[in-house]
Design a protein with these regions (language model features):
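Membrane-helix interface and helix-disruption motif detector
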Residues: 10-30, 47-52, 74-82, 95-106
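Hydrophobic alpha-helical transmembrane segments of integral membrane proteins
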Residues: 1-12, 33-39, 111-118
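Alpha-helical transmembrane segments in multipass membrane proteins, preferentially the mid-helix core
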Residues: 32-54, 66-73, 116-123
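C-terminal membrane-adjacent module
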Residues: 63-131
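Central hydrophobic cores of alpha-helical transmembrane segments
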Residues: 1-4, 53-65
Length: 131
């Protein structure tokens, strides 16, 4: 119900003020981020795997969404093709694009490392449970 109410609120507020562009942007942004939340929910609730593997998938979803969700929203709203993470420069923390890219890269690499560790732990646990 919360997802439905989110979209109804966006439609009502923007429709009341005749802000069609705001409604489009709001619905796109809400869809992109609600999709991540629903993927995490379905993984945690319905995936038939142990907790380590579920956690690994959740970490991957969260890190990929953190790294690329803004670029996806920019493309869907404005048609701008950009991959912020391509601007990674760990020696430059002064420009906004480099700071964003550096943070996205750190989150993405950290998420992949953590998820890999969790996948290995999940595999070990699954193998140990089969014996």
């Amino acid at each position: 119900w919360d997802t439905l109410w989110l979209f109804l609120t966006i439609i009502e507020v923007c429709g009341h003020t005749n802000d069609v562009a705001g409604m489009k942007a709001g619905c796109i942004i809400a869809f992109v981020f609600v999709l991540a939340a629903w993927l995490i929910f379905f993984d945690a609730r319905y995936l038939n795997a142990n907790g380590f593997i579920k956690s690994a998938i959740i970490v991957l979803i969260a890190s990929f969404w953190t790294a690329f969700a803004d670029d996806i929203c920019e493309f869907l709203i404005f048609g701008t093709r950009q991959i912020t993470i391509k601007s990674v420069n760990f020696s430059d923390w002064t420009s906004n694009i480099c700071v964003n890219a550096n943070v996205y890269a750190i989150v993405l690499v950290s998420g992949i490392i953590i998820a890999s560790i969790l996948f290995v732990a999940g595999g070990i646990k699954a193998f140990a449970n089969k014996k």
